[in-house]
């Protein structure tokens, strides 16, 4: 190892710190969105439920990543693994349902916005949802067998895809589009922008932690 190089342990610690910070930020984002929209807004409640599910899924995903990057296999019957395997498809389903509602609003012509911009937004959102689903599923499959190199490569590939999509979604959330609601206030820009940056940073650090994690030999 070259002098001054960051050790695998430090990459792992940085990734876990970023992921736990993202859990707290996701819960805070859900609460802020509900407060800003008002408790009578049904769509805001769905968005808050989405944030809550995302935080819970991330808690379990982070626990599995902590073991995986320490070369500790997770038994197939482990409670955290089973919980993540059971819940993340529900999070993806809720995200897809909310995405479909937005897409219907775009297609209805009720919004006086540029169709190209709406298409780009819908495409980025859908890509983000599918990439996150693949990231969750890839770790679920890889966690019991940290020595499985193809499973590790698949997880790395999806983390590599998810990072730029998280950044793109963050840009979409903070850059106003003419005809698509009013311009966000400074507080909202800060909240959504900070959450997006945390998501990107946590994803990139998780990618590096997996890349540098020890490779146990097959039994």
What does each model-found stretch correspond to?
Residues 1-12:
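Short, Lys/Arg-rich N-terminal segment immediately upstream of the first membrane anchor
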Residues 2-4, 209-219:
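Short, charged juxtamembrane terminal tails flanking transmembrane helices
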């Amino acid at each position: 190892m070259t002098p001054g190089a960051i050790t695998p342990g430090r990459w792992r610690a940085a990734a876990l710190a970023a992921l736990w910070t993202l859990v707290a930020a996701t819960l805070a984002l859900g609460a802020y969105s509900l407060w800003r929209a008002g408790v009578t807004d049904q769509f805001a409640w769905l968005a808050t439920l989405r944030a809550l599910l995302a935080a819970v899924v991330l808690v379990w995903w982070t626990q599995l990543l902590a073991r995986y990057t320490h070369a500790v296999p997770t038994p197939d019957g482990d409670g955290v693994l089973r919980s993540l395997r059971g819940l993340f498809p529900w999070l993806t389903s809720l995200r897809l349902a909310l995405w479909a509602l937005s897409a219907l609003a775009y297609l209805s012509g009720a919004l006086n916005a540029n169709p190209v911009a709406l298409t780009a937004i819908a495409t980025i959102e859908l890509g983000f949802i599918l990439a996150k689903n693949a990231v969750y599923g890839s770790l679920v499959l890889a966690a019991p067998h940290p020595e499985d190199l193809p499973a590790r490569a698949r997880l790395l590939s999806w983390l590599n895809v998810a990072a730029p999509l998280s950044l793109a979604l963050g840009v979409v959330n903070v850059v106003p589009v003419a005809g698509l609601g009013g311009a966000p206030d400074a507080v909202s820009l800060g909240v959504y922008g900070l959450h997006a940056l945390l998501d990107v940073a946590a994803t990139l650090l998780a990618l590096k932690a997996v890349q540098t994690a020890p490779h146990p030999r097959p039994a």
